[in-house]
């Protein structure tokens, strides 16, 4: 690949390579959850213990995310993605080579430590190569890496695991090896001024004197819990709770993750259109909470809607990540975005690591509906934390235009400004606007 990829096609090609590399890291991080049925059936491993094993890559991520972010700000995306993928592959091969669950957990933890840089590097890469009016769409496409990685794991790992845990772990090992090669050949760092030429203001910490980033971190961490819980327990819920086969459950998990991938692209484009990353995040949080509460209400009641609600929450739960990553890179700037994304991913992974063992124990003692209800509290708590007034640099005019359109539409609705309908008088001195035609006012899009 050319080392000066200024063309549109070259930028998108780099983004696609970044997507594949990041998908491989999420395959490793989340793929262990698809070994749970094998661990339960072949080894008699309790669900709480299997959930703890599935969380080990996330615990490894927590340890190194900020360090990877610091390294990213200083050496660039290509180096971080290549080295991280290679080390993750080595850990996956090591985990596949041992029989003891203790040693498998150790190597999964080490692999999680190695995988921490890929997600931050991929987000920073997109922010560097794409202008503001395309960044939401590009970040949304790049963020399909997580559901695509999980979908590939759901489709392949359960079938391989029928031959043993070793066979299931070999799949992420091979994929991460290919990702390391792709990083070396296909990733090009975006052009940036050197740190020595940057102004003092550009190098200043974006956390100083502002709570914006901390609010984004807190909201995204809370929104991580529904994602973690559904990814970890959807497969085993379908098998044990509904009597599905491993193959049937794996296919449905794959379909839900593919729908989530398409949803991430759609909400990224939506954020470009409305000129805001955070307004969609608040709506996603509210929708996630409502869906989980509905699932808690109908589960165990013999309803035919519980599987549909599970698909819905598994899609909704993955929609927000790209929007938050785009907002962080835009607000933090090129010299702090690596560390800011490192902190962001650390807070998310703390939730991702804590979720499987805690909710595994809760499901064992109190059944699934209680777990869904408790999980719904997390996105509900995120709603007031989302900084909806934060506007992306370069899209302020578009955001204001959308706000004016919404304001005018709501004024019309509140004043019953419909054709042939009663109208409330406006403020003194305000000219009365005459509408013609018989079509009702439609809300702005």
Swiss-Prot record:
One of its GO terms (cellular component) is plasma membrane. GO terms for molecular function: transmembrane transporter activity. It is a multi-pass membrane protein. PROSITE patterns: MFS. The chain crosses the membrane at residues 16-36, 52-72, 98-118, 168-188, 219-239, 243-263, 283-303, 366-386. Residues 417-445 are annotated as: Disordered. Its main location: membrane. This is Uncharacterized MFS-type transporter MT3072. It comes from Mycobacterium tuberculosis (strain CDC 1551 / Oshkosh).
